[in-house]
Swiss-Prot record:
GO MF: toxin activity
Segments of skewed composition (Basic and acidic residues): 135-146
Leftover remarks: Found in injectable (milked) (IV) venom. The mature peptide does not contain cysteine residue.
Annotated TM spans: none
Proregion positions: 20-34, 58-80, 104-146
Name under which the protein is recorded: Linear conopeptide
Organism the protein comes from: Conus consors
GO CC term (a single one): extracellular region
Tissues in which the UniProt entry reports expression: Expressed by the venom duct.
Length: 146
């Protein structure tokens, strides 16, 4: 009985939320209907477990194991495998050992690396020593006030 009252309340509130235009009534008057007086007794309901409701009804997963998902049946596992340029031989590393990786870094051309100097300019920026004196033309880390 309680479920029937709740279902009726949901139905009435849904009808009030989306009113349909009726002949002879202005469009705004459709929202002005009041609830059924029998449904007003729902305000005095106490909380607690509803009758007929099992304790394990609200589970975080679907306990209905007979109905599987579609992708379990028709999806090819080979399609789902992650592919990259290094996965030709299963999970073989791109470099067999650490020495091979260091050889790759030193023997390959430098412009292939993301940290390569793009303009091939001089990377020597001079002495980065903090100095409090104000010397023109030299880099300073901080001012005298610091």
């Amino acid at each position: 009985m309680l479920r029937l009252i709740i279902a009726a309340a949901v139905l009435v509130s849904a009808c009030l939320a989306y009113p349909q235009r009726r002949e002879g009534a202005p469009a705004d008057a459709a929202n002005l209907q009041s609830f059924d007086p029998a449904l007003m007794s729902m305000q005095g309901m106490q909380g607690g477990q509803m009758p007929g409701m099992a304790g394990g009804q609200f589970l975080p997963f679907n306990p209905n194991l007979q109905m599987g998902y579609k992708r379990d049946f028709d999806e090819n596992l080979e399609k789902r495998k992650q592919h990259s340029q290094f996965n030709a031989d299963e999970n073989k590393a791109p470099f067999d050992s650490e020495e091979n990786f260091m050889n790759f870094l030193h023997n390959e051309k430098g412009d292939k690396h993301p940290f390569a100097n793009v303009d091939s300019a001089d990377t020597d920026l001079g002495q980065f020593e903090p100095s409090a004196e104000n010397k023109n033309g030299e880099f300073r880390f901080f001012d005298k006030e610091q």
